[in-house]
Amino acid sequence: MRDFPMFTTENGVGSLVLKEIPYSGIAYVTIRDSSVPKEFLNECLEFCKVVGAQHIYASGHEILTSYPFHTSVIRMSAAVDAIPQTDASIFPVTDKTIGRWREIYNDRMKCVDNAAFMSDAAASDLLKRGDGYFIHKDGELLGIGIASDDRIDCVASYKPGCGRTVVSALTHALMSEQVILEVASTNERAIRLYESLGFIKTAEISKWYKIF
């Protein structure tokens, strides 16, 4: 199922993320511009329901504050030099290991708010970009991640209690002085981990509300 980066009606312009519907039944709506947001939101809602959405979340307009709050997306940053070093090893995902990486990712992310399911197409894109990694220590798999430039886009522990090591390994693989990441405000355990490593909250990227 394809997304609609520009979903336009006579009542407004927005974005619809529908690719999660086959896996989780979830759709996301972002209101970009509307002079009649209530009417436009209802159009987005009905469209998402027609294509099979069972849970719908929306962001982008103050009208949404009348709905139940779901989560915020928080940006955090840290100085790379402030993150503890680790002797764990980092290995890029290959065409032989992408299947296992994807399996771990989908298992660990299935209960994380606003995390996307990794489809075959998304896994292929990851492999082409070359920014997916396994983190090992003493021959044991600790976790996986996605990192490039100055960003960490995914952290998932495989072995319980190894989140700090996974984050440290990914951070020190980056060629930058600062590292940034984004996390759902409801993922309190991850936020505590990042703060313990020296990350600070720098921005609230978006707020999401449950509209269906």
Feature annotation, model-predicted:
Residues H61-S72, R164, T186-E204:
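Conserved active-site alpha-helix within GNAT-family acetyltransferase domains
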Residues T9, L45-K49, I56-A58, L64-T65, ...:
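Alpha-helix C-terminal capping segments
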Residues V36-C48, K159-M175, I191-S196:
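Conserved acetyl-CoA-binding loop-helix of GNAT-fold acetyltransferases
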Residues M1-E10, C111-D138:
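Active-site rim helix/loop that mediates acceptor-substrate recognition in acyltransferases
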Residues I31-A88, I205-K210:
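Acyl-donor-binding surface of acyltransferase catalytic domains
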Residues M1-L45, K137-K159:
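Conserved donor-binding loop and adjoining core beta-sheet/short helix segment
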